[in-house]
């Protein structure tokens, strides 16, 4: 230990974050070190600009949507705990977690929470539905100008037609889950964090 990261995180904070996110002590310490290196203002929070300096997010077509997921509504800064809560959605599900206490809170990295997180990336206006326009905006972010507007419109129309079960021309969370029921979301939405 003895690093700057370990001295600035109190043991009780470390335990609370471990319990809430499922990360190990060493993972939390390592991620705290990364957090402080990103904190250019050295004020214990990250801004959107701090995130935009991360090369992997800067080149990701959904980078802005992912960055926005770190910030609570109306906030322009995120503290370490909020940072860890968002990252926890991407923590792989370990074998020993599959038989967790059914009465306890659902882990942030559960299939359901990963699906909610993904759904929110598409639900731009936060009305609990993915409209054709929202789908078009996200598709445009992902493919850039490589596909014509007409082709994108066809993809969006077909996607909504296949997913929309109640005929409202939008995709609800329930319909989103149904479409992805055979997709290994747990694996596809996981990042390996060093121990």
Swiss-Prot record:
The record places domain EF-hand at 26-61, 66-101, 110-145, 151-186
Q: Where is the lipid attached (N-myristoyl glycine)?
A: 2
Q: Could you say which residues bind Ca(2+) 1 here?
A: 123, 125, 127, 129, 134
**Cell compartment(s), UniProt:** Nucleus; Cytoplasm; Cytoplasm, Cytoskeleton; Endomembrane system
Gene3D superfamilies named in the record: EF-hand
Q: Where mainly located?
A: nucleus
Task: Tell me where the sequence motif Nuclear export signal 2 sits in this chain.
Answer: 176-185
Residue numbers binding Ca(2+) 2: 164, 166, 168, 175
Pfam families reported in the protein's UniProt record: EF-hand_7
Please give the biological process terms from Gene Ontology that the record holds. Answer: cellular response to acidic pH; cytoplasmic microtubule organization; membrane docking; membrane fusion; membrane organization; microtubule bundle formation; negative regulation of calcineurin-NFAT signaling cascade; negative regulation of NF-kappaB transcription factor activity
Subunit and interaction comment: Monomer. Interacts with STK17B; the interaction occurs in a calcium-independent manner and induces the translocation of CHP1 from the Golgi to the nucleus. Interacts with GAPDH; the interaction is direct, occurs in a N-myristoylation-dependent manner and facilitates the ability of CHP1 to bind microtubules. Interacts with KIF1B (via the C-terminal end of the kinesin-motor domain); the interaction occurs in a calcium-dependent manner.
Q: Which family does it belong to?
A: Belongs to the calcineurin regulatory subunit family. CHP subfamily.
Please give the name of this protein: Calcineurin B homologous protein 1
Gene source species: Bos taurus
Q: What is the lineage of its organism?
A: Eukaryota, Metazoa, Chordata, Craniata, Vertebrata
Q: Which gene encodes it?
A: CHP1
């Amino acid at each position: 230990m003895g690093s700057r990261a370990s001295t600035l995180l109190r043991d009780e904070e470390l335990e609370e974050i471990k319990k809430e996110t499922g990360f190990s002590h060493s993972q939390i310490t390592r991620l705290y070190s990364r957090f402080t290196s990103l904190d250019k203002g050295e004020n214990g929070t990250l801004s959107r600009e701090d995130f935009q300096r991360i090369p992997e997010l800067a080149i990701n077509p959904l980078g802005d949507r992912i960055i926005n997921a770190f910030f609570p509504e109306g906030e322009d800064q995120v503290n370490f705990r909020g940072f860890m809560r968002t990252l926890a959605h991407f923590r792989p599900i370990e074998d020993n977690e599959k038989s967790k206490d059914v009465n306890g809170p659902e882990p942030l990295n559960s299939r359901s929470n990963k699906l909610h997180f993904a759904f929110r990336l598409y639900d731009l206006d936060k009305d609990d539905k993915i409209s054709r326009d929202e789908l078009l905006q996200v598709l445009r972010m992902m493919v850039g100008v490589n596909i014509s507007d007409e082709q994108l419109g066809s993809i969006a129309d077909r996607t909504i037609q296949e997913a929309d079960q109640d005929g409202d021309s939008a995709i609800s969370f329930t319909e989103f889950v149904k479409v992805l029921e055979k997709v290994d979301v747990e694996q596809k939405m996981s990042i390996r964090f060093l121990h």
